[in-house]
Amino acid sequence: NENIMERFSLVLLIDPEHADIFDCFKENVNVDIRVYDGNNKIKLALYEMRLIWFGGVKYCYALELNKIGKLFKKKGIFWIPDFQHRTLPEFFGAEELAHKEKNDLAMTGSDNPMVLSSFDAARDLERFYPGHRCSVEVVHFVSYIEPEVRAITPELEQSVREKFDLKRNYIYIPNQFWQHKNHIVMVEAIECLLKEGRLCDYDFVFTGNLKDYRNPEYIDKLRKIMESDTVCANIKLLGFVERTEQLAIMKNAQFIVQPSLCEGWGTVLEDAKVLDKVVLLSNIPVHQEQQNKKCVLFDPHDPKQLAETIARTAARASLPEHEAEYAGNMEQGIANMYREAREYSRA
């Protein structure tokens, strides 16, 4: 937003793990990027206090109401990514549920501004905290990944194919393995397909670490299906993958599957939009709000329906007349990303 950039400078406090995401802003005179040591909490707290007290900071986003945050509450703009602990409480332990509820009650009980990433989240706020005092702004976001996707050269694509042994057509499932990401419906759909002898010449590619500290028994259930004789030859578990490599994998997939049960505003879908990819998308309300014309909705609780949707989409992708549609037009995707970013910043 040009009006904001003329009036304010931004100081971004970033942990080292995510610092490279913001490299593209280093040349912007209005953006000051500061990487902190996330392992030293005391040092970070002192740095934050010094920055806010003496650095002329007017607003703090997204402020957390911890001991430091409470000192600067008047400057705070809050953000709650989603209300998963309310919609899917069975995925959380009692201690974590209590902690999240305490934080959300403190934020929603304040008259500070509250940013939410979707109108679906705004409806949840009204449903779960009808007496809230915060002033709400819904601000959608895009994936600003133009530098990363432009770094995907034919040479990089070839090296990624060789590194991860991606010789066959494949379908990509990019999420981390939290239970709410709902990989179980995907692996059960794969099992249905392969038992019937369909898509045996396809690979199903997963990235992210096969862990969920909240629900280890869920991971055991996933692992049992993935390692079964029926599906193991067609499943590739790549683990944690570097960001540009991940985008190269997405770019060259036949299509993407996103079966999640809860999202605030899905980054996977925004990435896929920039690459102009076809996405099979769970039909949860936020996805219905976020989808574009290249999305196909399915019931996230019905593996047989998903299996049929995958088979039908794969058949369409194999037809020469649809080759360009499934390859994706990255230039068009980048243009759409900028258009949407302008629209969101004016909202």
PLM region descriptions:
Residues 1-347:
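Carbohydrate transferase catalytic cores enriched for Leloir-type hexosyltransferases
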